């Protein structure tokens, strides 16, 4: 059975708190797991959330500030300790290669797993698989930062009433899907486009073109909202977003489910982030993330 969900491992910005771990997010996409921004303590949070090293297939790092990458050392060593049977690919800003290598080889351990380093240098497609295309866009932060966007290819949805009208049933349904036509009836005659799902992960950044490009038409957008709108100048100065800005981005992009995260420790009321995102005009499904939360990707239209 296919599962598409976000497992939230940590939601703090800069420093962990009593209730929030450093960042960490696992996207389960059918049989694959993509780990985003493993901050300090991610390995333990995986244990608490029921996420095994075997669940990981890709690691995507947006930038090399500690709250988004210090957990790499422990996660990589755990992958090797558990002898994960498949290859792991790591994506990260190429300008931070030295940081990745320091974290990968922070201490002595036995390497048992093939880990492919795939540094990112520019906007564009970084992985093209039968199940999805993974893209990056440059963001605006004091250090080089990239956001990630996963796009599922469009498919086709068979329409029972049209199949019946053309007398197509049983094994012929599978045949027309494979071959594209049967006896003058085309696949387009008995089906419609089923748009693939889209997911985006946007961390530390000011508002910029990359934010909007990543968010466009997403079924789920996971986005930082470090500050509330009253501290918008702090957000701008330090390369971050406010909850209101995140809400406006999601509204303009037609996002279906907005997930807010990466909260400054200066705020004690999580509901304030939802209020400000709503005030920004977003009317879709909205989640203020907390540690160990599971958020299903919205079902296809």
Curated annotation (Swiss-Prot):
Cofactor(s) listed in the protein's UniProt record: Zn(2+)
Residues binding Zn(2+) 1: 63, 65, 141, 204
Active site per UniProt: 67 (proton acceptor)
Enzyme class: hydrolase
Entries under CDD domains matching the protein: RNaseZ_ZiPD-like_MBL-fold
Cofactor binding description: Binds 2 Zn(2+) ions.
Keyword annotations of the record: Endonuclease, Hydrolase, Metal-binding, Nuclease, tRNA processing, Zinc
Binding positions (Zn(2+) 2): 67-68, 204, 262
Single annotated GO MF: 3'-tRNA processing endoribonuclease activity
Domain of life of the organism encoding this protein: Bacteria
Catalytic activities: Endonucleolytic cleavage of RNA, removing extra 3' nucleotides from tRNA precursor, generating 3' termini of tRNAs. A 3'-hydroxy group is left at the tRNA terminus and a 5'-phosphoryl group is left at the trailer molecule
PANTHER family named among the record's database cross-references: ZINC PHOSPHODIESTERASE ELAC PROTEIN 1
Name used for this protein in its record: Ribonuclease Z
Species of origin: Streptomyces avermitilis (strain ATCC 31267 / DSM 46492 / JCM 5070 / NBRC 14893 / NCIMB 12804 / NRRL 8165 / MA-4680)
Species lineage: Bacteria, Bacillati, Actinomycetota, Actinomycetes, Kitasatosporales
